[in-house]
């Protein structure tokens, strides 16, 4: 194969991927490949509990450690974020409560990895551990402790929609079948772990982020909102990306945390996450229980289709607030179905992942 760009052409001309040559030759630079002289190392302290109140956080020893340039907690992040304005219920660093094992509690920026790790070890956090529920059904049971105070039944959002007369459609069917399907939680397992390089500009009081995202403009908006600065003070650059598959279609907490650390340290911070942390921060396909009912005529025509879906949406709304709509919006496919009924409940469950 030639490593030269293809000649211009149309039909019949072999056209490789526009970025393929850079990738196969190793010229492509990913976020973790970017080097910034003097960059500090960012690290995140995460909750060991699935659900707990934060009673107290003491960062004084970490702040006093030589080589530490910044320490941030939930006190530095008063603005929540989320994929939609109706579901902004997550903070970059936990405030008052943690809602999954791995929820970010504090973050540090230090001169090197060893110093950053020592600083994390010096941060003291007192927790009041609360009940945790690891299935959607358990979280929805009567008497279950609310994960979010404004959602006492742990149901994030209910979706109910009907098009046509489903009852009449089932009555007219020659055959009605019902079946329940259980879909396991799936992590996208993209090859590149999460990473952000955040640079603070003292002259314009702004930040520039190079980050592993599929949606740089969305990251731009959320970083500005959480840092409480103008959008014009934030620049987001998307380098080559080692996979995403939907897991990086929203702003994630580590991107905002990197920006916070860079601003507080008034410098540059590289925040590289381990594979375990990337799994903890993932926005994978949620566990979903689907009960489907279909009405058919003898000639194969569908008379009605009904779906009930219960989804373990995780500790925060995230993209799940949209995913639950897909369970119904996409179920008809290319078929001619005169009546469709869709009922869905995404719920919040404190768990091992977000």
Located regions from the model:
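Flexible, low-hydrophobicity surface segments
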Residues: 1-157, 176-179
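Gly/Pro-rich active-site capping loops and adjacent beta-alpha segments
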Residues: 6-7, 79, 115-137, 158, ...
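Flexible hinge/switch segments at interdomain interfaces of large molecular machines
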Residues: 31-40, 191-194, 339-352
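Short coil/turn connectors at secondary-structure junctions
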Residues: 38-41, 65-69, 95, 102-105, ...
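Alpha-helical support elements that line or immediately flank enzyme active sites
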Residues: 44-72, 106-127, 196-265, 322-332
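Beta-strand segments within the central parallel beta-sheet cores of soluble alpha/beta enzyme folds
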Residues: 74, 233-239, 266-276, 303-308, ...
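Glycine-rich and small/hydrophobic secondary-structure elements
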Residues: 89-116, 246-298, 354
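Helix-loop-helix junctions that connect adjacent transmembrane helices in secondary transporters/permeases
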Residues: 141-227
């Amino acid at each position: 194969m030639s490593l030269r760009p293809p000649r211009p052409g149309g039909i019949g001309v072999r056209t490789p991927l526009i970025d393929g040559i850079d990738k196969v030759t190793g010229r492509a630079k990913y976020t973790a490949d970017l080097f910034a002289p003097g960059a500090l190392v960012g690290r995140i302290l995460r909750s060991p509990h699935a659900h707990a109140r934060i009673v107290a956080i003491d960062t004084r020893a970490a702040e006093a450690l030589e080589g530490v340039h910044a320490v941030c907690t939930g006190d530095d992040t008063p603005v929540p974020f989320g994929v939609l304005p109706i579901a902004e219920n997550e903070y970059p660093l936990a405030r008052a409560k943690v809602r999954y094992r791995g929820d970010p509690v504090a973050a540090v920026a230090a001169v090197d990895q060893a110093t950053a790790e020592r600083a994390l070890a010096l941060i003291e956090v007192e927790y009041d551990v609360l009940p945790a529920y690891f299935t959607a059904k358990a979280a929805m049971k009567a008497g279950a402790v609310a994960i979010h105070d404004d959602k006492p039944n742990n149901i994030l959002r209910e979706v109910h929609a009907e098009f046509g007369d489903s009852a009449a459609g089932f009555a007219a069917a020659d055959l009605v079948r019902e079946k329940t399907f259980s879909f396991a939680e799936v992590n996208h397992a993209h090859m590149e772990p999460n990473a952000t390089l955040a640079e603070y500009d003292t002259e314009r009081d702004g930040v520039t982020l190079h980050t592993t995202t599929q949606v740089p403009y969305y990251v731009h908006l959320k970083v500005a909102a959480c840092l409480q600065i103008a959008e014009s003070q934030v620049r987001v650059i998307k380098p080559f990306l080692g996979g995403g598959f939907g897991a990086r279609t929203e702003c994630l907490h580590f991107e905002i945390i990197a920006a916070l650390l860079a601003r507080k340290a008034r410098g540059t911070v590289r925040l590289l996450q381990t594979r375990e942390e990337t799994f903890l921060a993932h926005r994978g396909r949620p566990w979903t229980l689907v009960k489907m009912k279909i009405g058919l005529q003898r000639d194969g025509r569908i008379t009605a289709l009904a779906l009930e879906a219960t989804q373990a949406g995780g500790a925060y709304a995230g993209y799940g607030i949209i995913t639950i709509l897909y369970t119904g919006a996409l179920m008809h496919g290319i078929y001619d179905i005169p009546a469709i009924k869709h009922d869905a409940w995404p719920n919040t469950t404190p768990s091992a992942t977000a």
